[in-house]
Amino acid sequence: MHLVKTPVFTLVMINRVLIRLKIIQIVYAYYQNGSKNLDAAEKELFFSLSKAYDLYNYLLMLMIALTNYAQKRIDAAKAKLAPTAEELYPNMKFVENKFISQLEVNRQLMDFISNQKRTWENDEDFVKGLFEKIVASDIYKEYMASSENSYEADRELWRKLYKTFIFNNEELDILSLIHISEPTRLR
């Protein structure tokens, strides 16, 4: 199993703690089950880890989708009949985020996307709503106003956004369950 690697940044990583937790859950279920089928327990463990890996990549894809949505809004504003100076020359810091640029060229993530055929296009309303919450936040405003232009600052923005808007998002939990459990729904 290959994980999407990004320097010093983790989201919902399949780490040792998660693996240990899944093993304990499977062992408990194994002993609670009267048949004691070791092969079934092993299959359940691999299935569970596979779904955690899917969720990890799905959340990485959400960051890319949010950035792409921001770019679409910028493009639409520039294409207006009479755009303002701010619309013609917007602050591009969010859409030119170095961390997201790294994700967009990550071969493992792109392979996952093409193999799983998952996308956020079907949930544009969710992406739009989440983006609007992000733009209204102090985290976003401080980032956009900052003169710091580094990979670390870009990565830190996404760490803060993830903790604030993605980590405990009930609507996202529901969407994730739907998409991860029904792979044919997308595309």
Residue ranges and their predicted role:
Residues 1-2, 178:
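Accessible peptide chain termini
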Residues 2-12:
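Short, Lys/Arg-enriched N-terminal segments with co-localized hydrophobic residues
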Residues 12-172:
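N-terminal, charged low-complexity regulatory/assembly segments
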Residues 178-186:
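Residue-level detector of conserved catalytic or cofactor/ligand-binding positions
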